Curated annotation (Swiss-Prot):
GO molecular function, one term: toxin activity
Keywords of the record: Calcium channel impairing toxin, Disulfide bond, Ion channel impairing toxin, Knottin, Neurotoxin, Secreted, Signal, Toxin, Voltage-gated calcium channel impairing toxin
Free-text comment on this protein's domains from its UniProt entry: The presence of a 'disulfide through disulfide knot' structurally defines this protein as a knottin.
Full protein name: U9-ctenitoxin-Pn1a
């Protein structure tokens, strides 16, 4: 019985040791998440200071409009008109 208790305690210690040294968020998508955070945001997607808005249709600049703490990239009127009339 004493041997079983010692083996159980040893197993718990090894599991705890391996858990401490495990890499947090060590999945394949981690690089994609970091790259997406650095990139630009499309129209009607959330934006902030490090993540600016992408250029729109025909190179029109999009603005990051904030309402409280909710910031979204908005299309400009020129961009919407150019897309509607095919320019």
């Amino acid at each position: 019985m004493w041997l079983k208790t010692q083996l159980f305690v040893l197993a718990i210690a090894v599991i705890a040791l391996l858990e401490v040294h495990a890499e947090p968020e060590s999945n394949d998508n981690n690089e994609l998440v970091v790259e997406e955070a650095r990139g630009c945001a499309d129209a009607y997607k959330s934006c902030n200071h490090p993540r600016t808005c992408c250029d729109g249709y025909n190179g029109y600049k999009r603005a990051c409009i904030c309402s409280g703490s909710n910031c979204k990239c908005k299309k400009s009127l020129r961009e919407m008109a150019a897309a509607a009339f095919g320019r």
